């Protein structure tokens, strides 16, 4: 499986911006309530359920980079936009926890966005935006390229299989920092050591190493495990959703409406009204990582013929 298909030639910047607009339309994001901006590190900023802004970064050599950051941040936006009106301007108006919040972003980015039915559904449009780069690439080739498993330097560009290794590096460093066994000045060296140990990756500089995320500089220590927790929550929600909704039939049409409606009913509307564990239980039963493990096993044994 090669990723050369995704990033072999220059992707015109304006087309990426137009494609991002298209993806937001597919997700059902009302542009009168959800803006899109550009930044170095994608993030979502919410004011209330009528005003949410998402951002992305355009890599002129890789259309998939912005594609999946828009789907990810769009998932955050849908959560905030789906919170009930009567909770607005109270302490219950935001998402209940970052673990649940990341379950929504990674649900749209990976469980739906990297699924074969969804990729096949939107791929004609992808080729329409990028005919020179992807005109001769089949939907199956593109699907395999955006799901290729390989160690990577940047967390936000990691595949689903190796993503949690990036989280583990940060978690180990945070534990040492908070426990007083590691000083901040030594973080770059420990980061490089762990990336080599966990992923076999050489870290070339601090910008692409311990400074690649905005979390620590913003004081968000202890945040990174929420990505792993959210991935597991999302897989469990998907398993339960499949009992109520024709998920893959909808995805194959590029219609995410019934998927978002289910999440809005089971998760979004409650904001912070319930405890995180109760939100998860209400949506899909007691938490277990088993659905996530099974999901990854099925997906990657199929992709690699194992």
Predicted regions and their residues:
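Single conserved hydrophobic/aromatic residue that forms the stacking wall/gate
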Residues: 1-7, 11
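Zn2+-dependent metallopeptidase catalytic core
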Residues: 13-32
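Post-HExxH zinc-binding segment in Zn-dependent metallohydrolases
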Residues: 94-135
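Acidic/polar loop patches that form or flank catalytic/metal-binding clefts of enzymes
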Residues: 31-33, 86-90, 114-124, 184-185
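Short pre-active-site segment immediately N-terminal to the catalytic Zn-binding motif
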Residues: 55-69
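C-terminal, non-catalytic "cap/extension" segments appended to globular domains
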Residues: 167, 171-306
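Active-site recognition of the HExxH zinc-binding catalytic motif
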Residues: 65-84, 102-106
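Long, charged, glycine-rich C-terminal linkers/tails
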Residues: 31-51
């Amino acid at each position: 499986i090669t990723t050369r298909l995704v990033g072999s030639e220059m992707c015109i910047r304006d087309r990426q911006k137009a494609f991002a607009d298209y993806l937001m339309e597919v997700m059902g994001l009302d542009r009168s309530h959800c803006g899109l901006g550009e930044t170095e590190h994608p993030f979502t900023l919410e004011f209330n359920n009528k005003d949410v802004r998402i951002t992305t970064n355009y890599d002129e050599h890789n259309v998939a980079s912005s594609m999946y950051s828009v789907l990810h941040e769009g998932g955050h936006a849908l959560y905030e936009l789906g919170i009930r009106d009567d909770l607005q301007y109270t302490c219950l108006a935001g998402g209940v926890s970052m673990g649940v919040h990341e379950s929504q972003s990674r649900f749209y980015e990976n469980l739906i966005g990297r699924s074969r039915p969804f990729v096949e559904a939107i791929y004609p449009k992808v080729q329409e935006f990028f005919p020179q780069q992807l005109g001769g690439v089949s939907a199956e080739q593109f699907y395999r390229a955006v799901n290729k498993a390989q160690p990577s330097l940047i967390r936000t560009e990691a595949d689903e299989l190796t993503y949690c290794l990036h989280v583990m590096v940060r978690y180990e460093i945070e534990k040492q920092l908070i426990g007083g066994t590691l000083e901040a000045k030594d973080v770059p060296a420990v980061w490089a050591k762990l990336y080599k140990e966990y992923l076999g990756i050489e870290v070339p500089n601090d910008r692409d190493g311990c400074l690649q995320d905005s979390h620590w500089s913003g004081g968000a220590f202890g945040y990174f495990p929420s990505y792993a927790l959210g991935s597991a929550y999302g897989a469990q929600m998907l398993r339960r959703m499949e009992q109520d909704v024709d998920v893959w039939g909808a995805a194959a049409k590029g219609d995410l409406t019934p998927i978002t409606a289910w999440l809005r009913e089971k998760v979004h509307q409650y904001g912070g009204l319930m405890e995180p564990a109760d939100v998860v239980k209400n949506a899909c039963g007691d938490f277990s990582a088993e659905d996530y493990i099974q999901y990854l096993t099925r997906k990657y044994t199929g992709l690699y013929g194992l």
